[in-house]
Amino acid sequence: MEYFQVLLPLAIILVISKIFGKICVRIGIPQVIGLIAAGILVSVVEYIPGPMQDFFASGSPALTGLGFFAKIGVVLIMFNAGLDINVKQIKSVGLPATIITLAGVFVPMILGFIAACLIRNGTMIGLTHDQYFTNLFYGVIMTATSVSVTVATLQELGKLTSKVGTTVVTAAILDDIVGIIVLSVVIGMSGKEGGEAENPWIVLLKTVLFFIAAFLVGWLARKIFAAVERNFPHHRLLPVMSVALCFFFAYAAEKVFGVADITGAFVAGMVLSSNPEANYIERRSEIMGYMMFTPVFFANIAIANKFSLPDMNMLIFGLVFVVVALLGKVIGCGGTALLCKYSKKDSFRVGIGMMARAEVALVCAQKGVDAGLIHADIMPFIILLIVVSSLVTPILLKASYKEDKKKIDMAAAAVLAENAAKKKEN
């Protein structure tokens, strides 16, 4: 492939992605939706006769090149997700937040698995190996959480540091970690990424060994980074070395331990998240990612998967998938919060707060498509899930606090009236 063949499609994708992304931010929906919409628009070029048609045809050199950019993009997305992890907060996590996290991962996963079995296969008994792991992976996709919308809403309401706010933020951090581990284990057990299915215990052992090796290497890396930081404070050398560590972890995870490359990237971010310059590293790596690789990943979801109208079975399953994914978090997190002695209102708020999804759900789904575990037909419904959850979450959260706000306003009005009466008496 001549390298220049990818340059024109790349330029088109970057410009259209940025425009669509900004439009989505302006109207209050996640930027990733705009990036995917840009990919859908660009993918239509394949069907329009003209000089651009060959660039976006299936199997074209340009699409192959874009695929490589997309894979780097997904690694950087997960690296930044790992950098967002607050390790100190994890250490201070209480039992309720831990239980809520585990329920928030496994309840949606089990419900998703059951729904997939019943709708796609009509039964949960006598499934083949491939059917079992395909259905299980649909459940795994439901485990992902993105609380950026929730955090913004709670901040607006002045409730971010409340019991609900602290629980949601902490549970979301743990949710990411547990979800990524589950993803790696399921892909490894399925045998879809390069060979025969492995014994579950072997997969778990490899995953544990990877985490041990990663944190040992990470400990050494932190020492080196600290020395670099002392001699070159706020220098670009630090983010460059950080991204290099991310790529090394992603490679080692996939090649040496048989763990998903995105897990390696995520752990690299976690390892560096406690670095005093973590925010600086994250800003720089995000700039690098969102300048080129990340928009290509989201646009490539639409271009490579060739979205088309689903058949009736897929339509029914897709809509059920969205509903189960939404309710799974509310039931799993909200129900468990209730068992942990949270009030009914606070339990509902925790469930709603954990309901939102974003780019990590797309990353997990694309990993399943690439591994041959699931069909690309599910992707439009994951996009629908992101849109619906991003719009519904702030509405329901604000509604749940409406009565509290009324009581505060009434109490404030009563105090003002009392003060006014005292002034008149004087």
Specify the residue positions occupied by each region the protein language model found.
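Transmembrane helical cores of multi-pass secondary ion antiporters/exchangers
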Residues: 1-426
